[in-house]
Amino acid sequence: MTRKTRYLHQITTLILGGLLIVPAAAPPVSADIAATHVYHNHMPNFWAYYDLNTYNSTPVGSPIRYTYDGEVIQLKQNPPAGYPYYLPNGSPMPHDDLVSYYSHHAKTGAYLTWPWSVANTLHSSHPQAQMHVTMSGSVVNNVNSIIQQGNVSGYNNPAWGTPWKNAVTQLKTAGGDNRLDLIHFSGHHSMGPLVGNDYLLKDMIYHGATMAQPYFLGSSYKSSKGFFPTELGFSERIIPVLNKLGIQWSVIGNNHFSRTLKDYPLLDSPGTDTMISPPNRSDLQNVSTAGAWVNEPMFNEQQVVYNKYPFASTAHWVRYVDPATGAESRVVGVPVAQAQSWEEGYLGQVKADALKPYENLVAQKQIFVVAHDGDNSSGRAGSEETWRNAGNVTYADSGVTGMGIDEYLRSNTPAAADVVHVQDGSWIDTRDSSSDPAWYHWHLPFGIWKGQFAAFNQVNGTAYAPKKNLAGVEEGMTVSFEKGYHYLERNFALLQASLNYAKTAEQIWLEEHPNYWKPANPLDREVTYEGNQLNPWMLSYPVKGNPANDYAGGANPAELAWYFLLPAMDSGFGYYDENVDDSVKPALSFNQSLYFSKPYVSQKLAKDKTGPSVWWPQRYPYNPGSANVSKAEGWTLQHYNNAFAIYTYAFDTSGISEIKVKVRAHRDKTADAADNTFKVYDPAGLAAAGIANIDPAKVGAWTEYPMNVRDLSADINGVDWQPSSMTIMQKVPATDIGNLYFSYISDYRDQLLDYFIEAKDAKGNVTQSDIQQVYVGAGKYKLANGKYTESMQGTIEGTHPFITDVPAVPDTEAPAVPANLQATVMNASSVGLSWNAATDNIRVTGYEIYRNGVRIGTTPSTSYTDSGLSASTAYEYRVKAYDASGNLSGFSAAATATTPAGNHVTVYYKQGYSTPYIHYRPAGGTWTTAPGVAIPAAEVAGYNKITINIGAATQLEACFNNGSGTWDSNGGSNYLFGTGTWTYTPTGKIQAGAPVAPSATPTVAPTATPTPKPSVTPTVTPITTPTVAPTLSPTPTVAPTVKPSATPIATPTVTPTVSPTATPTVVPTIAPTATPTTSPSATPVPTATPAGNSATIYYKNTAFSNSYIHYKLDGATAWTTSPGVQMQASTFSGYKAITIPLGSATGLTAAFNNGSGIWDNNGGSNYHFGTGSSSLTGGNLITGEPQADSVTFRVSVPGSTPANAPVYLTGSFNSWNAADPAYLLTRGSDGIYSITLNLPAGSAVTYKLTRGSWATVETASSGADITNRTLTPAGGAQTVTLTVQRWKDQ
């Protein structure tokens, strides 16, 4: 029989009471400690891209491949024609600098030299030692791809796999095991407990097929006995997959053993153990009376790991019981020293000292397993010295023997009855959720971060706020199934759709091909299990099959669907937050998988016998009725009442017709790991069938709860209140997604429960999830000495966990009436309005403007300009406020204004442009915004006509355009029209009076169509648009010599400026007038622009919807007429601009206002501008054009800061992630740490400095916590200088 068959036979024998490896009576063991190392090497397929358009034209038998990393480097350097994926900044996706990644010595050493070199050294000095190493399938293919492409220095040996093969096959331990043991792993770094067993099985088969590729181990590949779970993330749910592939043992984090002991000491100390919630009491199933509890602080970190030795330092059996049949699967669980593994990865060496006090307390030898990355570019994990320190330091220590896991189990296999329960969870140092059994580093229930509520409420028209804990503190994250969102959670909803299509394609294909493929040679059997299945070589390395001949000679649609699906769920895509485009890498693979599975399944849907894909049931909170302090609460300690939710994501190709949660209560408040009663759906039935360890009296009947559904199709590619995430998601839009199903349950208190989800599709196919357990606490608390303690006798009801589980109360409250409406006459044809902001119970979203009782417009701001009015006319204005729900306030008090008499200019324009625009200003006044105003058709055929009120001015300066950038501006000199009526033809001819109607419609277009763009495009300001004055310059009849008693007095509501008491220093009370001595002739001749200096001023003030500059030239006494000259939009976002001729002056003095009495005058000192360009925002005046809004933080740190310690900025802009790599500061040669961020002007942020965790956050010099730092960026380029007084851990 095969090796796998032999092993399964051995397990069966063990279950029946026989022996596996050691005799029933274990011999005495020595007191020394066994020690070994596990090194993890991996790089993702960073961009598993395949041009689907090439599939149909690919010849049969040709390889079908997504890009490995060598090809990705080429793709980024030279994107192919039609390549569709680019970041918002225009660079090709992915963002990753792969050349830099792979060039690091940690990569080249771990992949190309260290492992076999160190194995040779161990071979000569430690006869029982093994190096257990993972080389993921993706990193093997990536390294080979880079060598083939030759695009990374150092990767140049085509036979790079030969030293690996030689070391694996030739170096043996004293017991005959592989010295270099390439243990099992999921090929694409997928986390089995999160992706599910179907996905994990395929990914592990892929890994085996990759190990057996000719460029790596080839035909010499032999399946290892061991397994390393991705991110050290283990669950008993994956044991059937390990058994199916003949795997005998798995490493598991040691604290996941300890957190299942019934004497766990920290249930009432939430957050103490690795900064997460205490274990749910349903996990406390094991008993150990030997040894003691030990707290192990992680080196240089805030987390403290709690373990009980020797229970957490000896191997035990762990098992899975099939809930339908009661059949058992089991493997040996080997504990990994979590804290010490981190320490070696950080410092480069570690000893087994923590275990020495507990030697010889039990029959088994303790084992000290150090497991960490072998290729990590940070810390010391990716160092040859660290690899060698296993033998030089750890195994050289007194009382410690280098002994691989296979060697250890040869004489230390657990007794058959030594079966324990292990808690779900992962590696210890994810920082935000260290080894959390809820896996919150890689997914998070749909929710709303505290800093997102403002945007959430604005988009949804709601008034939600974070709920508060019993101490009155707002939580950092609020779970909301109805309205929340999270990019990581989205991936698991997307997965259910692609997974179900792939599984259904596989089911249909294998049913149609009952003898399709099964292992036929020894290498096949090393890679996969026995029986009819998809071809593992084709789902790992497909070639084109013949679609016209049942895909003969290559991969069928099911194999292609799996091949393209497997790269999707690399856990690294969710490890570093959204990290530019990591969040959409799964969608790329999902879409490519669906390209092959969906059409195939759709054509054969009548043959669907696959049940719905249902993600393993989730619950929130993790500890119902008890204490929780996890990432899902935003690390806010919550003491909840007894309500909780069960939820999942589910999808079926035929549609889900029914889905429900089933819950049953236990008789007792505790359970035991050896008991099978609570592990099966039907205890009575299976007990009657002879399944051992079942007592039906221990559990009650199942109670069914229907599930609510949230259709996620509308949110498949993001939500509007998370715009940055949405922008990236829409670069690679997903196409199919599972829905969210959830049930709220509050019928239990102080009880142990089982639950599972059952779903049925439209064809009657049923899926039942695994059974899980939860202990629902009392939900009531006592308060003593400032601490809340759960108690059924408590008088304080816990906080309700949800805020959107009941329908939102409709907002029917109208905003308050706007006050202080002011109407200011601007000229003969326009009136400016301003008013005080109204208030509302949620938020005012805008205002309706009424003129003479008729609504004329709306605005989101508190000002409005009404244009196009008649001269010498009285107008009455009123304003209403409205909110997002459409509630309207009452009318404001009325404000009236009467326009003065004004001069008019009527222009007939002979059609040269099909839709002509006129861009104009009253001579010396303010220009319209380009392209100006469309000229309506005239009563005279072939002409357009417009009448313009120019107020007191006597001339109109203008040019014409087609609205799309083609201009007629009199060769850059513009046109001048006096008052009265004029006729213009595109030949440049201006004639007094209206045109004479032609006797016949012209049939020929004008001979001179005005197409050239003016030499100075008239788009923004009076200089960048028309600048030329009339031939005869007007002279003022009244000199501007009178100084006002008091000028602008209103204080801006937003802009941080001070209103002057009497500024600007000189403002004329009588506007200068100018009357030309004669009107322009029929063809006016413009005066040349005077030679001299000019000043171009860019001004940004988010409080002003309109900006005016009120100024005087240096050496002059005359100011412009208040409010001055209106500035126009510029090419720089948010900035208004103007260019002012200075003549012989060298500068000007100015103040700014909104045209309605709100001033920015530099605190009463005004601003001074020289020649050339200047930019002003938030009081920050710089020379030159505007710079992008940015803030450079320069941080001085205490002298006690560890050398080269990382310093991070954390705050409202990154959800308070204390170790966000995107906010890592750079240390300069002067010791100053700095980072530059693009923070928008005017948007306040709060923040602090950390060294990578909240244990190392900055404090006051006394060590006391400090309040959050705050900053409202002024705009433009800004530098903030900070000093850290002290770190919390010092």
Curated annotation (Swiss-Prot):
Reaction equation(s) it catalyzes: Endohydrolysis of (1->4)-alpha-D-glucosidic linkages in polysaccharides containing three or more (1->4)-alpha-linked D-glucose units
Residue ranges of domain CBM20 in the record: 1183-1289
InterPro entries xrefs: Carb-bd-like_fold, CBM20, CBM25, FN3_dom, FN3_sf, Glyco_hydro/deAcase_b/a-brl, Ig-like_fold
Family from the record: Belongs to the glycosyl hydrolase 119 (GH119) family.
Species for this entry: Niallia circulans
Gene behind this protein: igtZ
Record GO terms (molecular function): alpha-amylase activity; starch binding
Catalytic site: E231, D373
Region annotated Disordered, chain positions: 994-1037
Record-given protein name: Alpha-amylase
Keyword Hydrolase among UniProt keywords: yes
